[in-house]
Amino acid sequence: MKKIIILSIFFCSFSVKAQDNLLNLLSQDNEPIYITYLFKSTKVVNGQSVELPSKGVLQFTIQHRFGTLNSGFYNLYGLDNSQVRLGFDYGIKDFLAVGLGRSSTTKTIDANSKLRIKRQIRDGFPVTIVANFAAYVKQWQYTDNQLDNFLFTNQLSFAHQLLIASKINRDLTLQISPTMIHYNLVETLDEPNDKYSLGLGGRYKITKRISVNAEYFYQLNDKINNNVLSFGCDIETGGHVFQLHLSNSAAMFDRAFIHETNGNWLDGDIYFGFNISRVFTLNK
């Protein structure tokens, strides 16, 4: 009798444990599988991608742009002319990051924040959505006579973007970027303060560590300058991402390359450049 009772207790406990394991497996099966690594970098080429630094990770980026290739051998096809942007991006949360940078030629300081609203899910939600907000201020040198007419707010401009990307398959990612940029001060009365554009971009992986990227921004209500078209190649080497670029814009922040591009591909106004990114884990 005792043996029967002991065996009954054993089988009951085993049955309960097996049922718990089965429920755990079913629960795990119901958990969403998020799609990651849509791009290798926080940039597609010049523009922002849906990628953010992870929580507690600081990303340091050196961006370098040379002169136009059609400047001739005397300027070594643009290599004698260069400008630099230094940028820092930090992940506050896995869904929230902030950034700060400065460009040498235009003397512009830019700050931005990126908020991930929704993530692509395997066999579920088809896209990743990120909101990007940025502010820009141009540094000026002015004399005492100009100080009375100088307004700091006139040097400010702002960008609002919705970055929507989808990883179509293991190699191909596409992104669309509706953008609005506001200028506090414009040059003429006919020029709008609010300028709208639509960005299209994508990347295709050639190998595990190398991808080719392309990006185009079409200006919807501002026809003063040219639309920017850029091509790039991303090379991942451990903790670094090395990016090579060709573009008709030398600018390295959104406001400038979207709405202030004068270069024309057909005229040979092509700028070569590169980015080097390094990440540091500050807080796990």
Language model segments and positions:
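Bacterial Sec-dependent N-terminal signal peptides
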Residues: 1-22
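Small/flexible residues
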Residues: 4-5, 205, 280
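Generic alpha-helical secondary structure signal
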Residues: 15-16, 38, 208
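Transmembrane beta-barrel domains of Gram-negative outer membranes and organellar outer membranes
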Residues: 19-148, 156-160, 165-176, 180-184, ...
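A mid-sequence, solvent-exposed acidic-amphipathic segment
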Residues: 171-217
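Outer-membrane beta-barrel proteins
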Residues: 220-223
